[in-house]
Amino acid sequence: MANAAQKKLAAQNKHILTFMLAADLIVNVLFWILRFFVRSGLSKFSKFVYAFASISSGFLHYQLHRAAAPKYDARGSLLYVGQDLLQEGVTSYMVDYMYFSWILIFLAALTSVKVFAFYLLVPIFVVYKAAPLLKMLLQQLKNFKNQALNQPPQQQQQQQQQQHQQHATPSEPVLSKRQQKLRKKAAKYSRP
């Protein structure tokens, strides 16, 4: 069977996208039924927050559908597999955000719209995930600065270490690593 892996990925993506569409519809319909027919109505702010949650989740579903939906020709043969929805990275974060939105919408339908305050966790999560990237970016900027000064980072660190050693022990001569190793070996064998 030719392209079995691609066909398997296409079927997997189609299944996941169908599940996402069904879950999105069910959660939103349940919200409307529970909030307007079973419980009291919503304030303007609550409607705004619900609209934000629903529209952002729907937008991400649309983007994932565009990127991952398999495309077939008229005969039914696979033309485009689509992006893997189970891969790590931005796709994973988009799916997680959709699940998070659905959970909050469902909980807001059951309890109170104050549950939407948990959306404040999203920027905290973004900062948590972006901190290592920011640290790496700052290190790269530092390396670029060193390159602009025509000093590689290792050479600059060695110079700083040598200056530190010279200031720390001015009376003792600075020994190379090889000399230090030879002295340790000599001291080891000279002891009876």
UniProtKB/Swiss-Prot annotation:
Localization: Endoplasmic reticulum membrane
GO biological process: meiotic cell cycle; protein insertion into ER membrane; protein targeting to ER; vacuolar protein processing
Region (Disordered): 149-192
Signal peptide range in chain numbering: none
Ranges of biased composition (kind: Basic residues): 178-192
Keyword field contains Endoplasmic reticulum: yes
Topology of the protein relative to the lipid bilayer: Multi-pass membrane protein
Compositional bias annotation for Low complexity: 151-167
Pfam family, one: TMEM208_SND2
Keywords for this protein: Endoplasmic reticulum, Meiosis, Membrane, Transmembrane, Transmembrane helix
Transmembrane intervals: 16-36, 102-122
Any one annotated GO CC term: vacuole
Family: Belongs to the TMEM208 family.
Known function: May function in a SRP (signal recognition particle) and GET (guided entry of tail-anchored proteins) independent pathway for targeting a broad range of substrate proteins to the endoplasmic reticulum. Has a role in meiosis.
Name of the protein: SRP-independent targeting protein 2 homolog
Originating organism: Schizosaccharomyces pombe (strain 972 / ATCC 24843) (Fission yeast)
